[in-house]
């Protein structure tokens, strides 16, 4: 891995969030107590809460950081042909067992509106949402840039179901000797629950 990439990842890991989360009318905000990260992680939408829950219990996620600093420029063409280069802070910087990079989590309907308004920034290809300028920036460091489009209603129901069986698992963990097996079973259940949404 190039030294520049190692330095970038280190700065993402040890820098405070680029901005504070904001409360918005009609949205859900709060703090998620993460055992994986040993901190409370703020969220400002149901989508972000679902993303945090998923990454918290995903064995393939090593670490994840909200509102990763510093912000960076996204260069793309607007609908009018003008060149835009706004500073941008993705929702998360995620270290996975097979890759590392930035991630955006947005409602599906919001992504469709953004793609119509900024077609060179958000696009859908083969059913997957992408951000070409974000991917271009990440590629400079050998990293990834992922865009997750979610149905808010399905995500909310799945999150509620997920918390229900997670709480049950916590109680059973106190009576089982083989906690490793329990964790493996719960990880499979978590993936099955969330794959219905992804």
Segments the model singles out, each with a brief description of its role:
Residues 1-198:
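Electrostatic, structured charged patches in enzyme active sites and in nucleic-acid/phosphate-binding
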């Amino acid at each position: 891995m190039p030294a520049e990439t190692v330095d970038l990842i280190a700065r993402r890991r040890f820098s405070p969030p680029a901005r504070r989360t904001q409360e918005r009318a009609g949205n859900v905000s709060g703090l998620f107590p993460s055992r994986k990260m040993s901190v409370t992680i703020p969220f400002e939408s149901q989508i972000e809460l679902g993303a945090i829950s998923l990454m918290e219990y995903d064995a393939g996620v090593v670490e994840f950081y909200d509102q990763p600093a510093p912000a960076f420029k996204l260069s793309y063409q607007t609908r009018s042909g003008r060149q835009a280069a706004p500073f941008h802070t993705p929702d998360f910087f995620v270290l996975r067992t097979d890759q590392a990079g930035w991630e955006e989590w947005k409602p599906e309907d919001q992504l469709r509106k953004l793609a119509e308004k900024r077609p060179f920034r958000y696009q859908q290809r083969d059913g997957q949402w992408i951000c070409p300028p974000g991917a271009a920036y990440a590629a400079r460091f050998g990293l990834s840039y992922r865009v997750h489009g979610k149905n808010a209603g399905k995500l909310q129901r799945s999150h509620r179901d997920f918390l229900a069986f997670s709480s049950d698992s916590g109680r059973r963990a106190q009576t089982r000797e083989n906690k490793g097996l329990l964790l493996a079973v719960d990880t499979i259940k978590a993936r099955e629950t969330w794959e219905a949404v992804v």
